[in-house]
């Protein structure tokens, strides 16, 4: 928790404080579920059972099957796994289409793929951060192997219509992989997975600890998907390495907790957002950068006299 009760933390889009009940779940798991989930003896079997329960709980919040949910170390790893895996999986072309305001964990892998000869088309958003979906679709053709777009922008809170984007991409080329970075969207807006092949989420944005995330990988892509990692058979042979069971249980606890209150929280945060917007109008030197239709959890504004890090 905040050591100075007089401070108000305003940077939850960067990271959140771990919820006390989530920390309790992790602490208990570290003491009770110490065995490797892959071990064949009784303590290992109990760990595997707990891991499966955590996977099912997180999957329920996304509306996917348990087997379509893969634990990772963070949202950045989930993005890397999906993007580099897409390039390994689809060999029929070199075309990639991506929005121009993605997280570095999307930008950097695609820069590497561009250096390897892939044709990466970047579609920039408008001045208010709104992305023109039709402009992205204009670049999708028979050679497009991947389209990537974040659901909610982490800087200004713009929400992109990834559901429509995914449906239209599949209509143009059913073999094109559609990846969505939903790190800022999870537990803030409803997520519909129709026509989406891979989707990344992160724990430390929803009051779980840093060091745990997840990747949705659709059943329809599972068999063909070539993961960029090699190693053991964990996570259905797509993400090798002994699973971080305590943090997976923490992620499940955090997701379950927030999933129950998403509608009521949305109403409360919208009221706070509106109150802050109205209050900022009293200061002519303040410029609000987030559009009116941004998610209420993110409000970006500029003020020339105060450094952003001081305000946050």
Language model regions located:
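Pyridoxal 5′-phosphate
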Residues: 1-312
